[in-house]
């Protein structure tokens, strides 16, 4: 069975978690997850099962330049199966539309984030057993809405406008990525 990068990542994270906790007694590894959808101008929490209430997700930066997101659910997960189930269930809430090319065409971008906190007993703490080192990691998996040729999708009305907006957004994103990789623009 050929699985994608996210299921392989999930299996690898929990395999490594078990290995580290076995090799480093006292190490604690905690894993949380979030799943956001960007549709048009709005951000939606795909892990919030009560979709009838429009909860506001607030995205801002702190003075250090870190992106902070408030209002989203971030459940803790204990197993690879639990994490995969959360991803699968959240994916069911993605905004889709039917075109002649795809019955479930994604109309949004999605960001699936896995947060890993590793706490190791500090080797410098001779007598203080409460001292520890904390290592935090974040892995973002981004699924972009695909570009569409209107002549092939035969989209009309709302779906046509969404397709045009998706294509414009992907064009701008492509320009940003090229600019980030352009050596002549480094430092600007």
Language model features by range: what are they?
Residues 1-188:
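P-loop NTPase motor catalytic core
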């Amino acid at each position: 069975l050929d699985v994608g990068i996210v299921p392989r990542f999930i299996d690898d994270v929990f395999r490594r978690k078990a290995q580290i906790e076995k090799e480093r007694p006292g190490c604690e590894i905690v894993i949380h997850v979030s799943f956001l959808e960007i549709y048009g101008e709005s951000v939606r929490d795909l892990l919030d099962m009560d979709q009838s209430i429009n909860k506001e997700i607030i995205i801002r930066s702190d003075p250090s330049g870190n992106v902070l997101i408030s209002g989203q659910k971030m459940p803790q997960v204990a197993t690879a199966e639990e994490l995969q189930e959360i991803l699968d269930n959240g994916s069911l809430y993605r905004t889709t539309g039917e075109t002649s090319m795809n019955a479930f065409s994604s109309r949004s971008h999605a960001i699936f984030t896995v947060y890993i906190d590793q706490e190791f007993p500090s080797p410098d703490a001779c007598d203080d057993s409460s001292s520890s080192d904390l290592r935090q990691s974040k892995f973002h998996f981004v699924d972009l809405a695909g570009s569409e040729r209107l002549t092939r999708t035969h989209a009309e009305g709302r779906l046509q406008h969404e397709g045009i907006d998706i294509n414009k957004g992907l064009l701008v994103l492509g320009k940003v990525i090229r600019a980030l990789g352009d050596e002549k623009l480094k430092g600007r």
